[in-house]
Amino acid sequence: MGECLGEAAQCEVSGDVPVGAIVLDPEGRVIGRGRNERERHQDPTAHAEVVALRRAAEALGDWHLVGCTLVVTLEPCPMCAGAILAARVPRVVFGAWDDKAGAGGSVYDILRDRRLPHRAEVYAGVRGEECAAQLLAFFAPRR
């Protein structure tokens, strides 16, 4: 999670919401990194998770990320949860809960929805207070 917090901190330059993500291969090596880049690229899909998934798939030469783990500072939104499941990522670790648009158990539980053909194990709240503090520090002067 420390590496994810570091990725998120780099969002300060672009003015993006500070969310960072990494994808770990089955041996625990980082194969993809991402941070929010929506403002930087004017791309509404450039969430940290999607960026990390794209980079991991490129590194592996395969979009099937079977056996990998996605770690992210904020609970994934519905779009990111869909991308995670589409990539066949079996494990998601996140820090702060997203009580407005979370899809890992707060508002929605897309990642564990038994009606879908693929699901992921979810480990929530890892360094959650630290992840939430980073987001609060970003939004405080904007409100």
What is each residue range found by the language model?
Residues 40-51, 55:
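A short, polar/charged loop-to-alpha-helix boundary motif
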